[in-house]
Structure formats: C-alpha cells, structure tokens
Amino acid sequence: MDELNTLSWVLLGLGALVVGLSKTALPGAGTLAVVLFATALPARESTAGLLVLLIVGDLFAVWMYRHTVDWAILRRLIWPVLAGIAVGSVFLGLASDDAVRRVIGAILLTLLAFTLWRRRRGSTMKPGRLAGYGFGWLGGFTTMVANAGGPVMSLYLLGMRLDVKTFLGTAAYFFFAINLFKVPFQIGLGLLDLQMLSIVAVLVPLVVVAAFAGRWLASRIPQRAFEALVLVLTAVGALNLLI
C-alpha cells in the first residue's frame, strides 16, 4: 500500500465508485472500472483487486433482483463460460504484465466496436444456441482475464429480449456465481493475497455508497448521455493501455 501514490488512490477510488454504480444502476459501466484499476495497479494484480469489489457489488444486485431470474439461460451458459474461464486462467498464468495490459485494451476496444455496430445495425435477431456458446466462452475468458465480461453478456441478454427485471436478475446471479468461481483461480495464481485485500478493504465503503447512490440516480440521469460518456472514456482508457 505504501507504494501507491495519490493519483493511484484517486483512480482506485473512482473505480470503486463505478463498480457500485454499474451493479445497481448502469450495467456496462464496469468496463471503465477495469481501465481505472489497470492504470493504477499492475495489470494482472488489478484483476484480483477489482474482482473482490465486483463481488461486493454483486451482493447488492442479487438482493435487489433475487425474484427475477431466467434459470434456463444460466444453465445454457454454464459450460462454455467455465471453458472460457479455464483458458483465461492459463493465459493469466503465462502472460506478462504488459501482455495482459494490451489484451485488456484490445478486448475493451473490440467490445466497444461490436456494441456500436450492433446499435447502428439495430438488429433484433435472437441469438441461437451456437451464438450462446460463443458469447458464453468469450464472456468467461474476458471476465477471467480482465473482469470485462459484462459487455459481452449484456449484449447476449439484450439479444434474448428479456424484460428489464428479468435481464437484471439473470445478470446479477450470473456474475455473482462467476465471480465467486474465479476467486480460487486468482488465489492460485498468487494475484489475490493479503496485500491486495488490504488495498481493497479501503475501497469497499466506496462501493457500498455508490451502490445506494445508484438506486437513487438511476431514474434521474439520462441513460443515453451517461452510456455515451462511459463508451468514450472507456475507449480513451483502452487506447492508453495499448500505447
């Protein structure tokens, strides 16, 4: 903790606030937290610290939407997601810090481009079983390597044309289960240790405050404007990671 400067703490604090907001009000905004954490900490270690905060945020989302879950979708995704997590774990164990940082940046830019393309195309086609396997695998890999599975799975759930509450409930349980599953991998890789937990402990209150603030802000901030801001900031951050 002594090695972190003031700017690093500011970036981590902002990232913690974004985590809380993304779980209770603004799905998809979590990619900005990925950028902030990977900028403030070594890229590989940043995934472990962010994971703990995501689980804290997941607890709020699970409690709020515990009665609206499409269990059939979750059962369909489980095996491809687990395969993606396994591949991502091997990659984290073999890749250098610079490689992980660049992969995080490339993944975020790719997801942003795909999101914008889907919006521009205005496609309403419901993803088939093969697409579900592909989204599940990529979601598992990206969530293990960069905690960036949110945009992938959000696109898939949106494509399934779920109503808002079912979407939020299904996503809440999905990410809570997946994030818990990733903890032993992070410990085994030596990324989640007591030093990282001591840093995260300082940030947990910010996640809690932002989670409650998210419920209050959700009906007051123009969704389109905020989503556009998140996309722009994430793109700038991802480019910074690639340079």
Report the location of each language-model feature:
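Residues within membrane-spanning alpha-helices of integral membrane proteins
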Residues: 9, 48-51, 105-108, 112, ...
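Transmembrane helix exit motif
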Residues: 58-68, 89, 103-128, 215-216, ...
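Hydrophobic alpha-helical transmembrane segments in multi-pass integral membrane proteins
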Residues: 46, 88-93, 101, 141-148, ...
